[in-house]
Amino acid sequence: MATSLSVSRFMSSSATVISVAKPLLSPTVSFTAPLSFTRSLAPNLSLKFRNRRTNSASATTRSFATTPVTASISVGDKLPDSTLSYLDPSTGDVKTVTVSSLTAGKKTILFAVPGAFTPTCSQKHVPGFVSKAGELRSKGIDVIACISVNDAFVMEAWRKDLGINDEVMLLSDGNGEFTGKLGVELDLRDKPVGLGVRSRRYAILADDGVVKVLNLEEGGAFTNSSAEDMLKAL
């Protein structure tokens, strides 16, 4: 059961009274601590020991709230080169494209999703860029590409399922090479769905391969990497 321990220092006394109380039928036990003990404590110190399950949840919340979302890449950096793949829809052949050739001399939006056919990616993230592709291009964007740690065959099947034509390129980072160079790996090996190591969700605006905007999500969250967010940044 939970136990509450409260320590308070009385300004008019040379000792501190410590009360230990259990929430059920156990009586309250009080004793007076020696002055040497109280001097080692900061004034108005309060310690509380709660049920471990509650503590764990609150600690997790604090961690998400205070831990900065970081990556190896940052605004002002040149995008690392890497080879991505896709299926040519007219021939079914596997084609490759390098990040450098995709971005050289162009304004490019690269956005990543944790996985093809996953709910948020299929229902919100990719369709948002498809629907806003015209607006983005009217503001000077030359290339819009979605990257995922899936193989090229899965990405092509996903493209067909979403009914995408040439609005957005769906590119495979099958081995996670580009994802690793950016430092945005998402380790999902402890999850039961078998996703393994994927990419965190992000959206990057690059001008001639140099990062101008980097909207990086915590894991697979979807809060600041949408097409609307990129339109606001232009």
Curated annotation (Swiss-Prot):
Keyword Glycoprotein: no
Residue ranges constituting the Thioredoxin domain according to the UniProt record: 73-234
Localization: Plastid, Chloroplast stroma
Stored InterPro entries: PRX5-like, Redoxin, Thioredoxin-like_sf, Thioredoxin_domain
Record's signal peptide: none
Tissues in which the UniProt entry reports expression: Expressed in all tissues but predominantly in buds, siliques and seeds.
Catalytic activity: [glutaredoxin]-dithiol + a hydroperoxide = [glutaredoxin]-disulfide + an alcohol + H2O
Database matches in PANTHER family: PEROXIREDOXIN, PEROXIREDOXIN-5, MITOCHONDRIAL
Protein name: Peroxiredoxin-2E, chloroplastic
Gene from which the chain derives: PRXIIE
